[in-house]
Amino acid sequence: MNSFAYLFERFPSFVQTFVYREAAEMMRQGMNPWLVSLRRPEDPGELAEQISAEVFYAPEEKELRAQVDAERAARRLPRKPHRAIPRHRSQPDAQRMFEAIWLAPQLRERGVRHVHAHFGGVAARTAWWLQELFGFSYSFTGHANDIFCATELPVSNEMLVRGAKFVVTETDFARLWMEERYPHAVGRVFRVFNGIAMDGFPPREPAGAVPRIVSVGRYVEKKGFSDLIEACRFLRLRGVEFICEIIGGGPLESALRGQIAAAELGDCVQLVGPRSQAEVRRHLAAAHVFALACVPDQDGGSDNLPTVIMEAMATGVPVVSTRIAGVPEMITDGVEGFLTEPRHPAAFADALERMLRDTAVAEHLGRQGRESALGKFSVEKTTRALKHLLVQHAPVIPPTAARAADREIPTVSPWTRWLRRFRR
């Protein structure tokens, strides 16, 4: 019997390694969650071989709908989902309802009563339908734009929060933001930091005589790479010697390359493209300073708790970032790194220059950051906090009672096995 189910839109995902680490650690701590992914991974990287055997994948969308429609035609669905299909099938995001109807008997087969989703998006809305049609309880972890930006879908963010047993956020900033907008959720929103495996980030050994600035993230507005490049232009004008490597990929790549060329920074600022997690670690270990100039984007979204800042701290790299969302909960200005206001590249350049010119200060801040990361962000500690919430606030089987479950897909239609239980 599984203690609960993790429900993901797409798992594993190389750009969401913190989710993989949490799921793996939850299993190590004895909770025996059932891992369910609604879609197959596009970019699992080196994670796939480590955990893919543990993941149960839903069929492709058309096949899943066909299976549900066949069960309805044969009158093998409980009354509530049977009636819901014609009412909602043409609505936007109706696939979430079909996923819930298809998934419900699979969950019952494994004794699962509670579902935890990551992100207030596709998986959380499927979990909402599981509750609405079948009475399963759910919780979810909200991360950044999924909670900060409203959706125009039938299942709104407000409905997700109202229906959840509890909601997890990465930061106190996000917790207070949600409680202000959803007063009914006060007392049900909890802060649990994302976790990292500290042993995967050995202390750094900066490489090369030329100081190296490293930044990592998708090439999107909220990462502030345009401001970082502008800060690098200021550094060049001040005669500071450096190399800046920006690791990632995304829709702004062409614009960023144009900005680098226009500023004649091609010899010192490099867009190095996407890299594997192991390669990112090597770049961090060789860095003199890590920089992430986060900004709010035009839709009001922003980073909340950038995992890569945790990883830089764990490596002992001094950090320069901005005062936005939960970043000040990671970095206290002048203690673990330097913070500036968003969209002030000249001030960002000042902080970078101080790091690059005063190696004693940089080394001290790097050591402080590593100690802070050990205390706040170890995956063992953060997963234990989520496990406590699941046991205390949801119908979840505690670790001592969890048993290994048969993860094979049932050969007999699971709808037939539990139909009577849900006839109303």
Locate the predicted segments by residue.
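Carbohydrate-associated surface elements
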Residues: 173, 195
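Nucleotide-activated donor-binding/catalytic signature segment of Leloir-type glycosyltransferases, i.e.
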Residues: 257-278
